[in-house]
């Protein structure tokens, strides 16, 4: 399984799901890295986050669909409510809404898309009701990344990326306060309003989570 995901917390959850399913995993944190992987490695399954630092995951979905031979199963994931429709329109075979922690949801989706006579899969053909719990150290890493983006650049493109990134992380971590603040930032950005107060609120919450590991 190749996971194209910039959030370490979300990727850790998928890693645990793959581990419980008997599948091997590789990670790419951006489109560029994913393209390098796909030049030398042909996975059975690709799971692509839609909000990546160097572009939209739909770009990679479309590229994979145009390739021959095509990767067997192409799945998308996002914390956005509109993500599924966008991903399927781009050619994804299926979609995972964040948070993705249910082993049964993960296994059932992949197994439903695999040929019944496919013997080469590393995914076991059994389904478990277990939920995985990603390590919060990965969440801290995501907060450090968000803080770096906030300090570096607040241009429109970066604000859009930051909103997508934090929305997915907040949903994956069930962090309602961070999710609410991120949603307000996203609305203000779409309305082309001044973002000073919304950015300050998000930055404050990110710093709180970097300092206090018990917040989430």
Predicted regions and their residues:
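Acidic catalytic/metal-coordinating carboxylates
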Residues: 30, 56-59
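C-terminal output/effector regions of signal-responsive regulators
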Residues: 123-216
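The feature encodes the CheY-like receiver
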Residues: 53
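Active-site residues of response regulator receiver
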Residues: 49
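Alpha4 helix (beta4-alpha4-beta5 surface) of REC/receiver domains from two-component response regulators
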Residues: 59, 79-97, 104-108, 112
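Acidic, metal-coordinating helix/loop segments flanking the phosphotransfer/catalytic sites
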Residues: 27-45
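Short amphipathic alpha-helix used as the core "switch/output" element in two-component signaling
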Residues: 58-70
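Conserved acidic segment of CheY-like receiver
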Residues: 1-9, 14-18, 46
């Amino acid at each position: 399984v190749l996971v194209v995901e910039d959030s370490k917390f979300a990727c850790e959850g998928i890693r645990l799901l793959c581990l419980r399913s008997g599948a091997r995993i590789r990670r790419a944190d951006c489109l560029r890295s994913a393209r390098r992987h796909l030049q030398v490695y042909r996975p059975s399954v690709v799971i692509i986050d839609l909000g990546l630092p160097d572009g939209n995951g739909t770009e990679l979905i479309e590229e994979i669909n145009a390739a021959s031979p095509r990767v067997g199963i192409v799945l998308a994931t996002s914390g956005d409510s509109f993500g599924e429709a966008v991903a399927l329109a781009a050619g994804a075979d299926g979609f995972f809404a964040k948070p993705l922690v249910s082993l049964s949801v993960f296994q059932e989706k992949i197994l439903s898309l695999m040929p019944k006579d496919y013997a080469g899969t590393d995914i076991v053909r059994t389904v478990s009701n277990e939920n995985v719990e990603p390590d919060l150290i990965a969440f801290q890493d995501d907060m450090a990344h968000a803080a770096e983006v906030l300090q570096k650049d607040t241009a429109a493109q970066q604000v859009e990326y930051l909103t997508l990134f934090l929305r997915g992380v907040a949903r994956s971590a069930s962090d309602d306060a961070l999710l609410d603040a991120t949603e307000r930032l996203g609305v203000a950005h779409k309305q082309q309003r001044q973002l000073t107060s919304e950015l300050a609120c998000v930055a404050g919450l990110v710093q709180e989570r970097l300092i206090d590991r018990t917040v989430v």
